């Protein structure tokens, strides 16, 4: 939806809403970042992510925001960040260096594991 490296800027309403969520997270976490990328994601069972890095730039930070309205722990859908499992909890923002290996675990339910993935540059 938005990526400065790939010159993507969809300018759709959901992009504006995602930007508002980003700014709210920054304020609550007391972070100063300039957004570089916004991706929306939705995964179903069997859709495990490969472990990957969002960036190789030490000045970039990833914010993974879980968007599901309801989620039960037994549904799984954790995120692995540097070999640590982070439980999917609605309205949770997971913040980590973009250089960290991470990946999402497929849910054990027919419900989508939804999220917004932000990459920001420290300012």
Q: What are the roles of these predicted feature ranges?
A:
Residues 22-30, 51-53, 67-69, 82-83:
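Intrinsically disordered, low-complexity boundary segments flanking structured domains
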Residues 1, 46, 76-77:
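Glycine-centered flexibility motif
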Residues 1-34, 43:
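Non-heme Fe(II)/2-oxoglutarate
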Residues 40, 57, 68-123:
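Catalytic core of Fe(II)/2-oxoglutarate
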Residues 63:
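Substrate-binding/active-site groove segments that recognize
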Residues 40-57:
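Conserved short histidine dyad/triad with adjacent acidic residue
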């Amino acid at each position: 939806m938005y990526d400065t490296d790939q010159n993507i800027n969809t300018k759709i309403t959901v992009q504006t809403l995602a930007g508002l969520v980003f700014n709210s997270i920054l304020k609550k976490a007391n972070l100063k970042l300039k957004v570089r990328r916004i991706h929306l994601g939705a995964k179903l069972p069997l859709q495990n992510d490969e472990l990957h890095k969002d960036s190789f730039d030490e000045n970039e930070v990833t914010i993974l925001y879980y968007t599901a309205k309801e989620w039960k722990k037994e549904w799984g859908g954790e995120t692995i960040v540097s070999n640590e499992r982070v439980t999917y909890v609605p309205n949770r923002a997971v913040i980590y260096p973009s250089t960290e290996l991470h990946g999402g675990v497929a849910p054990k339910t027919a419900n989508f594991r939804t999220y917004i993935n932000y990459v920001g540059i420290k300012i």
